[in-house]
C-alpha cells in the first residue's frame, strides 16, 4: 500500500519508502541492489533485505508490479464502467446508461424500497422525484418506512456488494438451460463474468 505522496528524495535521489516509487512495493531501482545497499550483485538474487525489505531482483519488475492507494471515498474505475463490455453493468444487470446516470450524479437509485408500493429495487429517480418522496417520508402522518436511496460511486459499491455471486451463478445456469437465442447469449456473457469473479475470489 502506498501511504505517502513523496516520490524521490531530493538529497539521495532514491525513491522514498512507502511513497509512489517505493522500492519495497515495486522492486529495486537498480538491478540486483536493495535500497540500503546491503545486498549488491546477482549472487543475492531473490533475497529480501531484512533491513529495508526490498527484494534483490532486476529493476524491470517495476514496470509490472502494482501498488494500491486506500481512498477516503469509493471511486468508480473507468475501465470497468466504460470498457467493452462494461463489467459493472453486466454484474449489476442494468443498462450502461443507467449505471452512468448514477455514477455521474445525474440520478438517484433505490437501494431499499422499504414499504413503498410505487418504488422498486434499482429504480432510478430524478432529483425532483427524490425530493417529493423525501417530503412524504418526513411528513407528519407518513407511513413510509425503510426507504434507502443512493447516488454516485458509493451507491454503485453498495449495489455490487449486494450481488451474491455464487447464488447468482446458479440461478443463471438454470435460466440458460431453459432459454434460447439472444437472451441465452446475454445470460452466458453475464455468467462468464460472475464465474470469473467467483474463481479469482474477487469481491
From Swiss-Prot:
GO molecular function, a single term: metal ion binding
Domain of life from the UniProt record: Bacteria
Binding-site residues, Zn(2+): 34, 36, 49, 52
EC number(s) stated in the UniProt entry for this protein: 2.7.7.6
Enzyme class: transferase
Cofactor binding notes: Binds 1 Zn(2+) ion per subunit.
GO cellular component: a single term: DNA-directed RNA polymerase complex
Protein name (record): DNA-directed RNA polymerase subunit gamma
Species this chain originates from: Prochloron sp
Gene field: rpoC1
